[in-house]
């Protein structure tokens, strides 16, 4: 590893990592200087590492297609103190598998995977990709932002035909979070890939020990790491000690507890990732101007750059394109974007010619409502037969559903004299709030898997700029007894492999979401018979009563849907129950048509039987009913590439009517092209009409 010196801020942990490396001179400045200057937002030193494509590589960390597909995750020589390289390997393994279906019957190795080329053929063997990585922090000078930036430059990069693909992390994942969603396609295309962790990035602080993570996942104490930690809780050591005494075994997380509302910067940091990639490419391919330093070969706009990712990484790409004032981004391709749109009067979302009940709500609204109602709605007749996605016994889950319905009814929040009617009313309220009937069978697994509770709690903390010591709505993050769910000291600290195995949003990697009641903290599902209704209701009231500044902070993350006439594609699954299409993609497309009018170059592809988590597609009941949206994300990237490079027209907005695999849950037949109709130039009756602020999606 080579370290390129940037700024002067460097903590002991980083200093140790630099020992034995070669320090090359570089300076901060702007791209108009003769010498390639490190962007001013880069803090500390840049780590440069070359990978040979055999023992280690950019895409698979040396595991290859076979290793990524194996259920045996990579281990550590010393489990108590894994190396940075071992943590990187585990991070790539975990994040790749978290975003796609990794089963052969589900499409891995046939439609996607390291062995599959861009034409969809199995020609690449193990798919290892040689190249170079550049790793650094972006910061504002405070030492508290510390957004992780990473650029991968494959050995196949053609400096005469340069390209960049952004791969902003989805969820609150670490910097490798979108390696399967966008990084893989970019690397295979021979493009540099510009990653960033959005300033959420799986950073945690173990309150009881003071242990924090560094940029490479290795650990240090908060005091020794100083401003080089990925995240350190802002409270004083005495405040944290008092909190630990009252609430032991708790954890602070960066997205939830940084008090910075990081989402407001997601577009900006995605642009910074592109600028950092320009610097890296100039450093690698620019002319040598004084014997040691490189000049500038590429200036803003010189490199074909596609902003891409999924979920809130996709939302970040859209925000970046809107904020781009220097020509960094050429085009946008995103999947299932989590995006909060600033809707203007007159904009309308219709389906089958009729207005939908609700659209364009921000995540803070629909997530807190769903978290409150989903456990009850899961008991509705329309949700019968939903996939079961919980480690709890079915009897416990059924009891939770019954009790949540009863408590909601007692509070006057649902109507009905029995569980069935109460559940039906809860589901009807979700319909009225913009959820589609296509999502009926996903309401239960979105809550049972704890995806919705995790999002509701993390984002509520972020949008209220809460501290870990606030225990917002009596929720916190803690290790628990695996049998009782009560807060308990871990046998082994989850911090050791957090960088490699965590996803940044508890419950994750042994750190769980707990509700702090009179008897102490307990897994929120088990803390009360109604699964911590009081906490869920409190989260909902934050939004409905506009408490703790939540409205102001949500307004700060809204976007205008002005892509500045850049060509763009949005792909979204119609059945998505985590990021409902009415509130995200449909709303964005409608607002974009009002904002950009006929100058808009945005195409929208809505995938029937598509939902948010392709990694769930191997679960019984998911496999038979839902198809991989990732397949269409990659098709969209190919379409955009052909548009940019050969002028091929982008297919118009359309509904893609897929065919579920069917069969027996858990044993669905292999995915085939019969399940996955192509995106077409002439969609006919499947065309989505978009005009002057109105989108009408065929039934």
Curated annotation (Swiss-Prot):
A GO biological-process term: butyrate metabolic process
UniProt-annotated location(s): Secreted
Reaction catalysis annotation? (3R)-hydroxybutanoate dimer + H2O = 2 (R)-3-hydroxybutanoate + H(+)
User: Which GO molecular function annotations are given, in alphabetical order?
Assistant: hydroxybutyrate-dimer hydrolase activity
Signal peptide (UniProt feature, chain positions): 1-33
**Pathway participation:** Lipid metabolism; butanoate metabolism
The question of whether Secreted is a record keyword is answered with: yes
Gene Ontology cellular-component terms for this entry are: extracellular space
Active-site residues are 311
Write down the top EC class of this protein. hydrolase
Per the UniProt record, which EC number(s) apply here? 3.1.1.22
Question: What InterPro entries does the annotation carry?
Answer: AB_hydrolase_fold (IPR029058), OHBut_olig_hydro_put (IPR016582)
Keywords (alphabetical) are: Hydrolase, Secreted, Signal
Give the function comment from the record. Participates in the degradation of poly-3-hydroxybutyrate (PHB). It works downstream of poly(3-hydroxybutyrate) depolymerase, hydrolyzing D(-)-3-hydroxybutyrate oligomers of various length (3HB-oligomers) into 3HB-monomers.
Would you identify the family this protein belongs to, as annotated?
Belongs to the D-(-)-3-hydroxybutyrate oligomer hydrolase family.
State what protein this is by name.
Answer: D-(-)-3-hydroxybutyrate oligomer hydrolase
